[in-house]
Amino acid sequence: MDNYSLLSTPRPRISSSALSAFPDIMSSLATSLPDLGDTQNGEQLRRNCTIYRPWFSPYSYFVCTDKESHLEAYGFPEVDREEGRGDNCLLEDVAESVCSSSSSQENTYPREANRKSKHGLDSITSQDILMASKWHPAQQNGYKCASCCRMYPTLHSLKSHIKGGFKEGFSCKVYYRKLKTLWGKEQKARTGDRISLGSCQAFK
């Protein structure tokens, strides 16, 4: 029997000219992770920062929790974009509702109307979750999320998943917000049709 020795292959070295030819690669590597050396509390960030990989994603993300236990995800801009889209949609709906009201109400109470409508759309209740599950087949083992189709044993666990879904790398709350906005528009359209029908019958 011959003795085989393990061959160690040397790693390829990147020359300075190659690095200067591809500055985008180095800039992306430099901006992908936060620089812990520049911060004053570098040790604390090293303790509170972890690398997180969701089960559905092939990518890993650098996640940090600060002193107030707020979650910050580096390298995952989709969450912020989705949240931003949801907030923009809410602001557009609020603007439409304010514009549809009378001019006197716009001049006197625009901020209060914005706050009330935004708070109503932002809070997802158990009734909203049950209403969204009507379009899905009835589940015997628990409750199914209408956004990500995951099963949860109790309604409380599903509600907590919707509220804190951004910690898992995505947000089902945006989906339920949009559903609630659509339901509000449908309800307004139905009430408007009823009022128009009532006025037509009165004229007849």
From Swiss-Prot:
Subcellular location: Nucleus membrane
Tissue: Testis-specific.
Keyword set, alphabetical order: Differentiation, Membrane, Nucleus, Spermatogenesis
Observed phenotype of the null mutant: Deficient mice develop and grow normally. Knockout males, but not females, exhibit subfertile capacity. Deficient mice are characterized by abnormal sperm head shape and a failure of sperm-egg fusion.
Residue segments, region Disordered: 101-120
Transmembrane segments: none
Disulfide bonds, paired cysteine numbers: none
GO CC field: nuclear membrane
Record InterPro entries: Spt46-like
UniProt record, GO biological process: cell differentiation; fusion of sperm to egg plasma membrane involved in single fertilization; spermatogenesis
UniProt function note: Plays a role in spermiogenesis and fertilization.
Name of protein: Spermatogenesis-associated protein 46
Organism expressing this protein natively: Mus musculus
